[in-house]
Curated annotation (Swiss-Prot):
EC number per UniProt: 2.8.1.10
Name listed for the protein in its UniProt record: Thiazole synthase
One GO molecular-function entry: thiazole synthase activity
Gene: thiG
Signal peptide: none
Amino acid sequence: MLKIGDKQFESRLFTGTGKFANSRLMAEAIQVSGSQLATMALKRVDVNDQQDDILLPLVQAGVNLLPNTSGAKNAKDAVFAAQLAREALGTNWLKLEIHPDPKYLMPDPIETLSAAEQLVREGFIVLPYCHADPVLCKRLEEVGCAAVMPLGAPIGSNKGIVSHDFLEIIIDQANVPVVVDAGIGSPSHAARAMEMGADAVLVNTAIAASNDPVAMAKAFKLAVESGRMAYEAGLACKVSHAVASSPLTSFLDEL
């Protein structure tokens, strides 16, 4: 069981709501994935419409909502968006995203830390999207973030765990859950993150942009479960030389 803030999750696969062909497909894929937490940009939902085609199916399925501040270019924008989200959706959970560069969508570490400090003081449960920077992740933890969400690779790139070495350090030193977010392009990438000891992964593009999002969601569900199981079982140590699994040298010497 994964605990973040005041909630517990059986599923360690978190999902996004963007890039799906339609809301029906989004809802079906998220349901099949088993995900209990889905993020959405406030700008994509009509919070005044109880029948909003993104919000309604998630609420009906009992999926926890994680509004994000996508589109914010600085801390001021992010704090304002967070306050709107809390008022509109009735949740103090927030995925903090600040990426001023629209081409590469790299998170701004300085503005992210500044916004995180203020939002924590205002009572938000903050999950910041950030670079795979061990120092930054530790600082975000120290200011009170409920989890950290370092990137595996740039958003939507599907390149996988390119920040592997830094993620290992972050996971090793963290006292809050580590959710690998962005760049995960295949179920094997998700399994790898879980095998490293990540507490969860967040996947959107790899599911939504696949030829069969529902089947891909199921594949990610199984990958996350198997990766976590492998981590808990304890992976065999890597060695630089061969070690025979069934040595028969003494037997052969007797022939």
